[in-house]
Design a protein with these regions (language model features):
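Intrinsic N-terminal pre-sequences and regulatory tails
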Residues: 1-19, 23, 139
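Short, solvent-exposed interaction modules
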Residues: 64-117
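Extended intrinsically disordered, low-complexity coil regions enriched in Ser, Thr, Gly, Ala
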Residues: 47-80, 117-139
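Short, low-complexity cationic-aromatic patches
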Residues: 27-38, 45-54, 97-108, 114-127
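Terminal domain-initiation and capping elements
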Residues: 2-9, 28-32, 63-66, 106, ...
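Amphipathic alpha-helical segments within well-ordered protein domains
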Residues: 19-22, 41-45, 91, 110-114
Length: 139
């Protein structure tokens, strides 16, 4: 059972991730940033084979993991296997808000993951993704 202290710590970690992403995007709106994070995490999740998607999810902090797995239906999912499909998945996730550049969000979220997860975890995820999506990750 998660106690109050653990929940407060999990909240703090999730807020750090949001603050980091807001800085990377140059945004000041936490709601929009959270929506963009969730949309990009869903696109990533849907670009990976099921086992690889689970491996990535297991590396995320608990509240970010909740965003990642929200509304996931592994058997009925539509794969984001091309760059266009990946970016469309992000755009759909932010309700096609024209002020949000899906490409910038993809780069920022993948850079956030690269900064906060181990290099080995990132390389494993990249290896499982379609080659068309590799250049969305930081060099």
């Amino acid at each position: 059972m998660v106690g109050t202290l653990e929940f407060a710590q999990a909240t703090h970690i999730a807020e750090e991730w949001l603050d980091d992403l807001m800085a990377r995007l140059g945004w000041h709106d936490r709601y929009r940033t959270c929506a963009a994070l969730a949309a990009a995490l869903h696109a990533l999740r849907d670009a990976l084979p099921q086992e690889a998607a689970i491996d990535v999810g297991n590396q995320l902090p608990i509240l970010v993991r909740g965003l990642y797995y929200d509304a996931w239906h592994p058997r009925g999912r539509s794969a984001a296997r091309t760059r266009a499909a990946f970016l469309a998945r992000i755009q759909d996730g932010v309700h096609r808000e024209p002020a949000i550049d899906a490409d910038a969000v993809a780069h920022a979220v993948l850079a956030l993951l690269a900064a906060r997860l181990t290099a080995a975890e990132i390389e494993d995820a990249k290896a499982e993704m379609p080659h068309d999506l590799h250049n969305l990750w930081p060099s």
